[in-house]
Amino acid sequence: MTNTNNEYVLIAGSISKNTEKLYIDRAHSFVRALTKSILDANVGLVVYLAGEPVNENGALLTFDWTIVKEAVDLMENYTPAHQLKIVTSRSAMREKMSEENRMLIRKLQVARFADVSYLDDDLITGGNIGSEQVDAATAMIALGGGKGVSDRASKMRKANHPILPFDLELGGICDDGKGALGLHAHFYAEPLSMFPCTGEAVKNQLDTLSLQEPYYGLERLSEIAVELLKAEWAAQQLLHTPSVLILTALPVELAAAKKVFGIADDESPRLTSNGIHFWSTSIQRSDGPVTGIVASFASAGNVNASAITTMLLSEFKPQKVLMMGIAAGLREKMVLGEVIISERVIYYESAAALEGGKFAPRPEILCLHMPTKQNLNTYLATTSLSARLGERAQAIGLEMPVNSQAGDVAAGIIVSSATIASGELLIRDPALLERFRSLHDKACVAEMEAYGVFDACEKQGVPALIVRGISDFGDSTKDDAFHSIASVAAAIITADYLQHGWIRA
């Protein structure tokens, strides 16, 4: 559930004095519906209060007083929690407001439904008013208006706050720019500048959210608007402090991670400051959700893995890192589709070059942090593990083949701990795979990224685990047949471990 206690919406805009009554009435009715939907969602509103500009027929040309009067009518339905942030000035209170309107503000203050912020009378400019509103708001909805709306939107974009413009043709009180209509057109061109996390998804809905030619009733349209803002806030909250970084190297591994972690195949990635693609996910647990970031190295190799892991650690500062994917296994020890979790990683490339062209192995060995080792031991000892993994495999649609020409196949999803030999070689020689056991007699899995990930995490004090599905035996039978199966199996174990194995500090 999205925490909305500190979220505030600015409904920015105005109406031209020449706008038809039909559209003026629709705009104010929509703002009243929005006010209710926003308050229902435990979200607040930001307003600027001064006079009440009207056209020759007495129709109000701004929305702030509409919001306040609706809030006064509704406030008995809510627990007072300063849901309104009112920006005004002493001179505006004194010279531009009626006594009746001043009493409305007092009523909201006494009920603890509003906080009032007073601008210095000598500093009242459109820019300063806008800055004060934007400082208080975490989202903006735009209707009509001109340069003032555009200026507020520019400030909101710099703060990475969502902006939802509507297409109702209202003009603006100053007739000095395109306002919400310009923002609406901009949304189609650059959706992520308007909703930084969910912009592409919102863009796909924008045509159905027309206020000029409404498909939905105004109440439902206001509810959808708030739902979109809440989805964006939720996505941004996930990014602030993700619990776990989930890493892959190859496209087949990334596809498996997205499938198991519930990321739609057509969901557009976000970009880090270094241009690395990533997706947000959440794993539900009894002690609260685990927030995660899924990313990929986009190629194999420990050097690349170390560099990208370091960049992602610096950007997201996760509590834990899991790398998942495929690996080669020793035929005598492993079966196809089996999943292993690293208990240690050996970097087999390190050596001394001796006289006569001889090499003396000097392997680097990295082991699990003690808390991680304890978590893994407890996880593997759980009696319900096998049944739970079977249920997960069935739910995701993973079926192990009965047999394979390449060798023995796992009867189902099985997992154990193992020692990984990591280097820069794509293994197609079983004798070489066997020789890794001379470095450590428990080394029975070979791959190309684990040491890079472990080393990067070790340097920053972040615990890491490697989860690998066995896709081949590192010999002449090696092909791509088990890549997808082994990747999905590894992803299932990764998700299950995060839900049931990792004990948060």
Swiss-Prot record:
Gene Ontology annotations of biological process type: defense response to virus; L-methionine salvage from S-adenosylmethionine; nucleoside metabolic process
Reactions listed under catalytic activity: ATP + H2O = D-ribose 5-triphosphate + adenine; dATP + H2O = 2-deoxyribose 5-triphosphate + adenine
Keyword Translocase: no
GO molecular function, one term: adenosylhomocysteine nucleosidase activity
Keywords: Antiviral defense, Hydrolase
EC number assigned by the record: 3.5.99.-
Sequence segments annotated as region (Purine nucleoside phosphorylase domain): 239-505
Coiled coil segments of this chain: none
Pfam families: Cap17-like_N, PNP_UDP_1
Chain positions covered by the region annotation Cyclic oligonucleotide sensing-domain: 1-229
Disulphide bond pairs: none
Tree of life domain: Bacteria
SUPFAM superfamilies: Purine and uridine phosphorylases (SSF53167)
A GO cellular component annotation in the UniProt record: cytosol
Task of the protein: Effector protein with (d)ATP degrading activity of a CBASS antivirus system. CBASS (cyclic oligonucleotide-based antiphage signaling system) provides immunity against bacteriophage. A CD-NTase protein synthesizes cyclic nucleotides in response to infection; these serve as specific second messenger signals. The signals activate a diverse range of effectors, leading to bacterial cell death and thus abortive phage infection. A type III CBASS system.
Domain observations: Has 2 domains, an N-terminal domain probably involved in sensing cyclic nucleotides and C-terminal purine nucleoside phosphorylase (PNP) domain; the PNP domain has ATP nucleosidase activity. Expression of the C-terminal domain alone stops bacterial growth without cell lysis in E.coli.
Protein name: ATP nucleosidase Cap17
Organism lineage string: Bacteria, Pseudomonadati, Pseudomonadota, Gammaproteobacteria, Enterobacterales
